Amino acid sequence: MHKYFLIPAIIFFIIISLIVIYLQFFYLDWKWDVLPDNFDVKTETYTKKNLNKSCDDNGNIKLIKLDEDIRDNRVFIDSNDVSNDPSIHAIYLLPCDAKDRNFDINNDIHFTIQSINNWFLEKTKNQIINFDYNDNFIDTTFIRVNKSINWFTKFNSIEDNKKDAATKIEDLILSNKNIFKNFENKKFIIFFEGWEKRRSITDKVCGRSRYNGKIAIFYTNEKDKKIKSCTKDNIDKSNKKLFGESEQTILHEILHTLGTPPKCGKNVNFAESLHVSDNNDDIM
């Protein structure tokens, strides 16, 4: 066999082998990115998803309230503030077809934020982040919207970034400022019962925010049956004092909205990234 044929053939075989190894052992959930949302892997059939009657992906965006959403201690409008000081307000946001896991009323959000502030106090020695409280618990507003998870994640490479879930969430909050007290002095951490659609095979989004922005987002859910997950130690956990990967993501996104890392930092290159470059253990 001629060497000019053999060398390209060997290179091609090596490339294919590396791709197979990567998909088999490192990127385990590739198959779930190409399967349609309505494909049931157990029965290997396509199922028709019946949306709640309150869902309206084609109409105007509206805040809705299902009968089952009405629970003791749940609030749908921001509670009165004890001061006008700048603070961060928590929101539990659900698409119309999302399961309510009660993160707002079973204190999972409260204990997650408490874990973040305990860690932050220890690392900074004397600082905490000022969150919005009501009766000594994190003041969390429950919001359900008349859009399905598919509406939030309807995005592909030929569309611009305005179509991603994060921008839709940001627009939703900014256009409903009337349900919040002292809106101008608040930033928001959104616990969204959904996910951000992948942009590439290597890009998995666990949280989003803008530098010096108004909104930070943590994705509390994932596409069904994925093996690898941003939420493997999600806020739905028994160890209420854990500062795990979820808490790290939440704090990371909140700090971005507060202007961290500073642009004058010697270990940042804002032309390439909003993250520090000299320490892998740095929260930023």
Predicted regions and their residues:
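Structural recognition of the beta-strand scaffold that forms the well-ordered cores
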Residues: 88-92, 187-191, 216-219, 256-257, ...
